[in-house]
A protein has these predicted regions:
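Non-catalytic DNA-binding core/recognition domains of DNA-processing enzymes
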Residues: 1-8, 22, 130
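C-terminal catalytic core of tyrosine-transesterase DNA break-rejoin enzymes
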Residues: 72, 81, 85-92, 172, ...
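Conserved tyrosine-mediated DNA breakage-rejoining catalytic core shared by Y-recombinases
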Residues: 20-24, 30-33, 86, 95-144, ...
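C-terminal secondary-structure termini that scaffold catalytic or DNA-interacting sites
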Residues: 44-69, 115-127, 132-134, 140-152, ...
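Basic, Lys/Arg- and aromatic-enriched nucleic-acid-binding interface segment
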Residues: 10, 14-16, 20-94, 133-134, ...
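Short, polar N-cap/turn motifs at the start of nucleic acid-interacting alpha helices
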Residues: 99-105, 188, 207-228
């Protein structure tokens, strides 16, 4: 539009360019994400914490404090694994239930916004396929706590206690992740950066539409606007193909 108006002024079709001095919208800054090495560092540390908490229960009566420590460590591990696998928003992670998982397919239908349970940010449900390791971890954590209880156990994936009677808030998950990240030695840990890592990885692989679907964006333009920095520039194969077509006379 700016170029067209400048041309009109040059051709004396307009006296002046109405957009002169008007600045266009700022280009979104690249979303900061946790690199794959950092994610692996987080997973490794979380796994060690689960092993350490489990070791304290061997050979002694399990005290409530020891059990809470083990449950918290397991929740840390699941949080990193599921967030890095699904690309879900923190408000979506907070209200996931075991019943949302069908085989390896996770249905993301709910979200928390300012502490209020409702639909997802895009108001659209979506389904994502999880890695087999993530699914096995979810079932293991539920099965290991499913001993006879006075009351039935709830099915929230992230909960304050092993009873799983209520979900954790999105802020609580963010705090939990930040504390874990600092303990693991990760610089500036933030839960939403795992989501950005999923998007960046997929866009770098040329899978823009799959990134859009996994993140729950309404359209690909949203994904491209925020992650255009990750679009691969390796188009050598395209150049070679066009070169062959042009030379094939």
């Amino acid at each position: 539009l700016r170029s067209a108006l400048s041309w009109a002024v040059a051709e004396e079709l307009l006296r002046s360019n109405p957009l002169a001095g008007v600045r266009g919208p700022a280009r979104p800054q690249p979303r900061r994400h946790h690199a794959l090495a950092e994610v692996r560092q987080l997973l490794g540390y979380a796994e060690q914490e689960v092993e350490r908490a489990s070791a304290f229960l061997v050979g002694e009566r399990a005290s409530p404090r020891r059990l809470r420590s083990l449950f918290s460590a397991e929740q840390d591990l699941l949080l990193v694994r599921l967030a890095a696998d699904s690309g879900a928003r923190r408000g979506e992670l907070a209200v996931l239930r075991l019943g949302d998982l069908d085989g390896r397919v996770l249905s993301i239908e709910r979200g928390l916004s300012h502490g209020v349970l409702g639909s997802t940010k895009s108001s659209r449900a979506r389904r994502v396929t999880l890695g087999a390791t993530t699914v096995a971890l979810i079932h293991h954590q539920f099965d290991s706590w499913a001993e006879p209880r006075p009351t039935p156990m709830g099915d929230w994936l992230f909960a304050p206690t092993p009873a799983r009677e209520t979900f954790m808030t999105a802020d609580a998950l963010s705090h939990k992740f930040r504390r874990l990240g600092r303990s693991a030695g990760v610089e500036n840990p933030a839960l939403h950066r795992l989501r950005h890592g999923v998007a960046t990885h997929l866009v770098e692989k040329g899978k823009l539409l799959k990134a859009q679907a996994r993140l729950g964006h309404r359209d690909p333009s949203t994904t491209l606007r925020h992650y255009s920095h990750a679009v691969p520039l390796d188009d050598l194969d395209v150049a070679d193909e066009l070169d062959q077509v042009l030379n094939d006379r």
